[in-house]
């Protein structure tokens, strides 16, 4: 019983260290700002605008690594159409353990999705030590 409790504390502490801040204004050298975008890469509002203004997102590029940011398209349909882009991101994160990815509430702003719709797409990322998720995503994933 003690081991189980000890394990739960370790998992809890690990997750607390991997919660994305709600207001990111600067990044460390190895940190990547992960934001919801549109396929056309028109980074006009929300986290996409922050990525463009502060973290090197490229106007006209809607997907993937751009400077110190990573775009996941969320404006082109439902959750089923977003899933492949999240899967692609998770593979990228697995291949780049030297980077730490700060996932914002992708799709939960201008795109209009709820946390409980988007969070399950990131379930595989829970096991990656180099991916931080919003607290609201953790709550959905642990429910």
Predicted regions and their residues:
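Macrodomain-like recognition of ADP-ribose-binding/processing modules
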Residues: 2-143
């Amino acid at each position: 019983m003690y081991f189980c409790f000890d394990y739960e504390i370790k998992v809890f502490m690990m997750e607390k260290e991997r919660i994305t801040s709600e207001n990111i204004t600067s990044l460390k050298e190895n940190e990547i700002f992960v934001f919801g975008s549109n396929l056309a890469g028109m980074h006009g509002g929300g986290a996409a605008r922050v990525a463009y203004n502060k973290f090197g997102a490229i106007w006209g590029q809607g997907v993937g690594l751009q400077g110190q940011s990573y775009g996941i398209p969320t404006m082109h349909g439902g959750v089923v159409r977003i899933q492949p882009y999240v899967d692609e991101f998770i593979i990228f994160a697995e291949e780049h353990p030297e980077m730490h990815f700060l996932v914002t509430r992708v799709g939960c702003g201008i795109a209009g999705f709820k946390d409980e719709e988007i969070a399950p797409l990131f379930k595989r990322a829970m096991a990656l030590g180099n991916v931080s998720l919003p607290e609201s995503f953790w709550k959905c994933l642990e429910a």
